[in-house]
């Protein structure tokens, strides 16, 4: 099993200048070479990443410094991304600053369009390429969210 080695976050606001990049070292000796290859890192590089507790503490602190109120976890693939962020926060920190809920971008866009099948059409609003670099991917998602907001969906930011 491969737990995600890297993750990125961005505060959704017009400048998109507040970003976070976390790289966690493995927590298991088991790993999948094909899955790790997507990250662009070798197993040897992955072993040099920071301890998960340190990364998650830094991420929590970054959220506290950059987000007003409780942060909202919004993702392209919420079911995948949420499970491990939630686990890491609870296991290493004892709580998750996002609480117990999140939003999937495709569902937000489907609601705006009133079309269940519009769930992947929002991706056309990304300006930053979806490269699987976590910060690039988060920036592209945030760009799309800003456009979706311009199209009329109300957001708390």
What does each model-found stretch correspond to?
Residues 92-96, 114-121, 152:
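Substrate-binding/catalytic groove segments of enzymes
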Residues 72-78, 83-84, 119-157:
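Acidic, Mg2+-coordinating catalytic module of metal-dependent nucleases/exonucleases
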Residues 88-92, 111, 147-151:
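Active-site catalytic microenvironments for nucleophilic, acid-base chemistry
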Residues 49, 99-102:
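Non-catalytic, surface-exposed connector residues within folded enzymatic/regulatory domains
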Residues 24-26, 30-32, 36-39, 43-46, ...:
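Active-site-proximal helix-loop-helix substrate-binding element of RNase H-like nuclease domains
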Residues 1-79, 124:
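Conserved non-catalytic scaffold segment of RNase H-like nuclease domains
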Residues 79-100:
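Substrate-recognition/cap helix-loop segment adjacent to the acidic, metal-dependent catalytic center
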């Amino acid at each position: 099993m491969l737990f995600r080695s890297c993750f990125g976050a961005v505060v959704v606001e017009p400048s998109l200048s507040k970003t976070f990049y976390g790289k966690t070292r493995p927590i298991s000796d088991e790993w999948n070479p094909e899955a790790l290859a997507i990250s662009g890192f070798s197993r040897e590089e992955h072993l040099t990443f920071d301890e998960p507790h340190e990364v998650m503490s830094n991420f929590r602190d970054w959220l506290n410094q950059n987000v007003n109120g409780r942060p909202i976890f919004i993702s392209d693939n919420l079911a995948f991304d949420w499970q491990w962020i939630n686990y890491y926060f609870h296991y290493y920190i004892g709580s998750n600053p996002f609480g117990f809920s999140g939003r999937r971008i495709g569902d937000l866009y489907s609601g705006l369009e009133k079309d269940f099948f519009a769930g992947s059409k929002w991706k056309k609003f990304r300006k930053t390429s979806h490269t699987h670099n976590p910060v690039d991917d988060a920036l592209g998602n945030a760009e799309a969210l800003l456009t979706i907001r311009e199209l009329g969906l109300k957001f708390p930011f």
